[in-house]
């Protein structure tokens, strides 16, 4: 059965804080994430009366292998220390740290729950207040 046939469903799109604001030098990436958010909002309105919610999560920099590799690249190419390179990724988070993958997963889990039945068409920033 489809979500519409079941009159229940949860669609959670993975966007980024780049869907909420612009960033220099990554205009293509920002444009694609803005598109995800536009699709999320439009689809949420299309299925709002059919028991389906549609939301987007918008994480900031998450502590993943990709970020750790980027830190290593910054160190090797610039001579910065690891802490200096990491600061590039943590300075946009008022909490001064990377977002944990478990925090993103917990947000997705909540959006899938009955407790989030009235949450639809939203962009949920998971960035330690960086977009506040």
Language-model features and meaning:
Residues 1, 45-46, 117:
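Alpha-helical segment proximal to the catalytic Tyr-Lys
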Residues 8, 95-126, 131:
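C-terminal substrate-recognition "lid" of short-chain dehydrogenase/reductases
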Residues 16:
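Residue(s) in the substrate-gating loop at a strand-loop-helix junction
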Residues 21-27, 49-50, 96, 114:
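Active-site loop immediately N-terminal to the catalytic Tyr-X3-Lys motif
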Residues 32, 40:
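Active-site helix of classical SDR
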Residues 48, 53, 119-121:
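Short, small/polar-rich loop/turn modules that mediate ligand/substrate recognition or access, typified
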Residues 53-63, 112, 125-127:
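Conserved SDR Rossmann-fold cofactor-binding beta-strand/turn motif
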Residues 59-69, 73:
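Short, flexible catalytic-loop segment of classical short-chain dehydrogenase/reductase
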């Amino acid at each position: 059965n489809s979500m519409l046939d079941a009159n229940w469903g949860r669609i959670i799109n993975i966007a980024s804080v780049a869907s909420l604001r612009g960033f220099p030098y990554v205009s293509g990436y920002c444009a694609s994430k803005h598109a995800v958010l536009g699709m999320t909002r439009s689809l949420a309105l299309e299925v709002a009366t059919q028991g389906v919610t549609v939301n987007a999560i918008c994480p900031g920099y998450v502590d993943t292998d990709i970020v750790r590799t980027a830190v290593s690249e910054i160190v090797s190419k610039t001579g910065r220390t690891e802490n200096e390179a990491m600061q590039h990724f943590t300075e946009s988070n008022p909490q001064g740290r990377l977002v944990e993958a478990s925090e993103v997963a917990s947000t997705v889990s909540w959006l899938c729950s009955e407790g989030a039945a009235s949450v639809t068409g939203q962009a949920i920033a998971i960035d330690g207040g960086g977009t506040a």
